[in-house]
Amino acid sequence: METAPEDRAEPPSLAAIAALVSATAVRGPGIVPAVEVRDGGPGRERTEWLRTNLQPQKQAEYAQVLVSLELGDLTSGQMRALAALARAYGDGTVRVTVDQNLVLRWVKSGQVPGLYRRLATAGLGRPGAGTIMDVTSCPGAESCRLAVTQSRGLARLIGEELARQPLLTRRTEDV
C-alpha cells in the first residue's frame, strides 16, 4: 500500500506564486492561455471548486486535487508555480488526466484551503473539473496538418457560453 510522503517543502507565499506566474509573457500564434488571477478566499467559486475538483483518496485524511485547465493549456510560469505546489502540498508529482487536466495526489485534507488559495493566485483555481464545464478540445488547425477547423476557438466559445448558464450545467450532472 502506498504511504504519504514524509517530508514536504514549505508552501510558497502568495506573492511568490504571483511572481512566478507573471514573470513570463505568453506569446505566439493561435489561442494562448489567459491567466486569471483570483483571490481564492471563501466564496461561491471556492465552494464549487471544493465540490468538483477535490476527491478523497482511499488513505484517510488525504485527497487528490484536480487542476482544471482551460483547453488543456498552462503557461511556463503556471508550470513553475504548480511544481512548487506539488512539492509543498503533494508528493512532488503531477499527473495528467484524459480530460486535459492535472492531478496532485497526497494532499492533506486540512491543507486544501491553502493549496486552493495558491492555485487561484496562479490562475489555476478553475472549478468544474470533470463536468460539462470542463470542455476538452483537440489542437485543430492551430497545429494539426489534418485539421480543417479551429476546434480550440469553438471549444472556448462553448465553455464561455456554458459559464453563462449555471442552471444548465447543474442539470447535466446526472447525465
Predicted regions and their residues:
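Peripheral terminal and linker regions in Fe-S/redox and tRNA-modifying enzymes
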Residues: 1-175
